[in-house]
Each structure stands twice: as structure tokens, then as C-alpha cells.
Amino acid sequence: MSRPEQGYHLPAVTEGITRRQVLAGSAGLAGILALRQAPAFAQTREIRMLKSSNFVPASDAELKRQGEEWGRQNRATFVIDAVPTGKLNSKKAAVVTAQAGADINALWIGDEDLYFDHLVDLGDLAEDVGRKLGPWTNPDDFKIRNVWKAIPWYAVVWPMTYRTDLLERVGEKVPDTWEDLYRAGKKLKAIGHPIGIALAASDDANFGMRGLLWSYGSSYVGKDGKTVTINNPRTVEVVEFMKRFYKDCMEQEVLSWDDSNNNRCINAGKCSFIFNPTSAYEAAKKQGIKIRGTDRLIHEVMDHALPPRGPVERATSANYGMLGVWRFSKNVDACKDFLRFHYQEAEQNKFIETSAGYNIPFLEKLTGHPIWSSNPKYRFVKNIMKYTHPPAYPGPQTAASQVVMALHIIPEMFARAVTERMSTKEAIAWADKEISEVHAGRKRVTG
């Protein structure tokens, strides 16, 4: 999951689409009620969804299957435009500029504020889904200005992924706190197996460093979403901790990692711990990767655990995937109809299964899916959302919070301090200035 690149316009969707006339007469109405599905459209219409490519390709294949099935039932064509994660922001901005090119869009939490006037209110759909499959996890996290401008889709969470055999080798148990992880990490690095936590311009770094910051009781913005709070004694404490953690437990390569490097590091047999979604484990399992010099499969000695607890709390963040419908779409009713189909329990279960558990829903009923309960290496799923906060926590998600994410200000603050390019207080002051500039509207993402 790399970061935004130069954007370009998407082709516009076909115009001239009309809704099927309502069936007349009691026989027609009875037929609709018997089928219990929306009436098909008299003319074939095209629905386009813009989203990022899932790290588990089978998940995208299942979404495509669902779109095609819904399309057959409704005489519609469903097209998915899946782009690299790093291109999604620029592509979606191009769609809004052109007022064409997509009907349904995958969004990050905070996009609802950024594109508030361009998105359809999905409150009726969200409330209906919540009643059937919920309740929603922390529903207020998703409402912007008290409106459902998008429906929560799935979270990509950042648990610890670790090597059980290496931990046993140094005589340590699964770390419960950051200090536990530091103690184990020193021993692991000494035997050639460092910890890999990105401190670079990546999603892994953005989410990982937010969790660490919160676990020490700090934050970069207040509950009002406006007051910049990064410059405080708790931030000094957590930066000082990361300075010794980097020196004693990690290697310099983490300063330039993208979101694939930590996967490769643990699957190559080097890293002992990473903070990552379950894709590293699933890739090792699917590819049959062996521990170098042995016939043992590496996924057999990999496991997951909740993120460490800090002095104040256990905390982590996540990539909050959302789905929105553009107001400029000529197919708003059809888009909402597809989403109702996609959020049926049977379709959601298939979506979860094909992702091998990567797609973690925000709906309580679905988190008990057997794909997690049947595999002890996924036992963290049941509880991780209790400790998961949106990226701008404790404030609401806003357009400004999206920019702070895109500029990687939080991981850059840590990186400047651990490399001694700046002192701890200088790095924090730099972050304070950068975040304040964003919230004042003087600093934006370009390109």
C-alpha cells in the first residue's frame, strides 16, 4: 500500500440511463413481492466502482462475481476499476473534478468530510445493515457532521506478526507491553533477527506510529479535531522510547520501507516481529515458503497478537475502508441497490472467506465468522477492534486528518529523532508546525 501518485482522469460513464417503469397491476406487484428483489431495469445501465486493489486478489475476484450476479438480476453491467492503493486518492480526486468516471467509490475514513457535498447520504442503508448484521463497531466514528456519507466496508488492522520459534529461542513469551517487546527485541537483534517497524512514507508507518503515540497517552489533535496537541511531555516520552527501540531492536532499512518490505523481511527469515495485516502470514502459507536451510514451512512458526500496551493504554489504528456513492452519478438508486445486495449476510460471508480473513468487518455479527474462530492464529480478531482507533483519534476524521496522513508527518517526526537529524524536542516542534500548517489550510497534498 504505497502513497498517492500523480492523478489522471478516468473515462466518463455512459449517459442517458432511465429507470424501469414501475410494474402496474396487482399481478405485477405480487410478482415483485414473491421474488423479494428489486425489479430489473428496462435498459442495461453501467455501474462503475473505483477501488484500490486488495492485497488478497481472491477478494477482488469475489467482489467482481457479486457485481456480475447483481447485474444479471437487474439487467445492468457492473465494472470494477481496481487501482494500486497509492493511486486511489489521485484517481478519486480526478473523478470528482470531472464529475464522472465512477458511481461507487472506495473511500478512506475522512474522505466523507473532504467530499461531503459530493456524496449521497447513505443513512437509510447504514441503519438497515446495522440492524441486520450489527451493531456497527463505534458507529460515531463513521458519521461526519452526524451524517452517514459513506457506509463502513472493512478494516485492515495492524496486529503484531511474529516468529514463535525465534521468541522461544531467546527465552521470551509473547510481549504484552512495549517494554516487553523492547526487551525481547534486543535479544532477537543480537541473534540476527531484528524487529521490523516501518519509519517511512508508508501506511505501515502511519498506523504503527499512531498506535505507539496513543499508547503513551499522546495524540496529535484534540477531540475538537482542530487543536494541535502533539507538543506535550507524553510525546517527548514516546519519542525517547522509540530512539532506544530503533537503536537496540531495529536496523536502518526501516527508514526507507514501503508497505511490502516488512512482509518480505519476515518471510525471508530475517525479521522476528513486524506490525502488519495478515497478508504476510497468508502469503507464506499460500506460497509454501520454507525457513532458509530447512524443510520447515515458515507460516507454521508465525503467529499474530494484539499490539503492545503502553503506559496508558493498548492502542492501534487501521485502514478504515468505506464505500460512498457520488451525487453526480446517474445511477444512485442502482448503486444503493447493489450495496444492499453486497451487504446481505451470505454475500458478506463470501467476501470475508475469499479474503482469507484480511477483510475485517465493522459489524458485530460478522466478526464471529468461522474463518477466524477456527484458526488460533486469528484469535486476535475478536478483540482488536476494541483497541483500534481512527487515524485522527481522539478527534473526528476530517479533510485535514487526511492531509496529515498523506504527508506522513507522524512517522517522519519519529524518523527525524531516531536518526538524530533533530533532537527530540526539535522533531516534535517540527511536527507541531507541520500539523498546524495543515489545519490552517496552508499545507496540502500536491500532485
Predicted regions and their residues:
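Hinge/lid segment of periplasmic solute-binding proteins
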Residues: 108-159, 182, 208, 297-308, ...
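C-terminal lobe and pocket-closing loops
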Residues: 110, 279-298, 310-412, 442-447
